Amino acid sequence: MALQGWRFFGVSATIIIYIGGVLFLSMNNIPGSHPKRPRIERFAEFPSFHSPRFPMPSRKMTIRWCRDLKYINRDLPIYADYKSDFYTALPSDVSAALQSLPALTALASFPGSGNTWLRYLLQQATGILTGSIYKDYGLLKTGFPAENVCNSSVLLVKTHEWGSKAWAPFSKAILLVRDPEKAIIAEFNRQSGGHIGFASPDRYKRTKGKYWQQFVSNKLKGWEMMNLSWARNFTGSIKVVFYDDLVHHTERELRSILDFLQFPINEQLMRCAIMRKEGIFRRKKRLLSFDPYTESMRAEVQNRRRIVYGLLGRQEP
């Protein structure tokens, strides 16, 4: 009898525990019965990280071209790898085709001088693709499908190189020159944040500022060598364009460049190019809360600029 009583008690306890558990779970699942768990934001320290105003790098940027872009001559085989293919013996029919095309023109500049922006303007004003001795995948996907094309099927070819081997493919050149103080910062931004991004303030202060100081010293020498070697030693026709003139007198400079290239001006395309001149490849201004140049650095930059500008026939203001 006692055994049956214990069995009855055990079964009853099990049923009570089961019913209690069901009621507890039901109450916790009723909407509004408990506060919502706060949402954890990724990259919360960057409130605009996912904002449409600041597109993710992987998002494809689209450009409204004034006209569909094309090659000057689609029938010409594209020998795209400059370093490995340009100096090899080409088939006779390709060599003949190259010789029958207009002279190959370089768009030479020190990095950070506005080369990409000028290419963008010229593609808008002509509808013709521009090439490059490099293969920048970022540019390849965002408006420059002829990256790494280095022959006269394109309007001109971008280069940041100098010296006899760099000059060899070209019979004409446009030398784009920018104030070294601004060009060096633009190149520092490009290496840190891409073609339209910026370097964080912390990058200027790496290794207690020694990294930035060495960067300026190296790039200033490169800026001087790049501009003077092309201006003095290139044996073909050369036109010097100053970035500041391109910014303040865009249409005048574009017309002058197209005249140098002996490319007919389409007035409708020119108006369209000027209307869309900003594009996405001209880095917007950003004011730093500090001056990255020390007094001695700025004095050296200004001295080199004065010497180079004087040799290029540019009068300092």
Curated annotation (Swiss-Prot):
Transmembrane segments: 8-28
Glycan-linked positions: N151, N227, N233
Keywords: Glycoprotein, Membrane, Transmembrane, Transmembrane helix
GO cellular component: membrane
Outcome of substituting V149L: In strain: ZBMEL157
Membrane topology: Single-pass membrane protein
Main location: membrane
Cellular compartments annotated: Membrane
Highest taxon of source: Eukaryota
Family to which the UniProt record says this protein belongs: Belongs to the WSCD family.
Protein name: WSCD family member CG9164
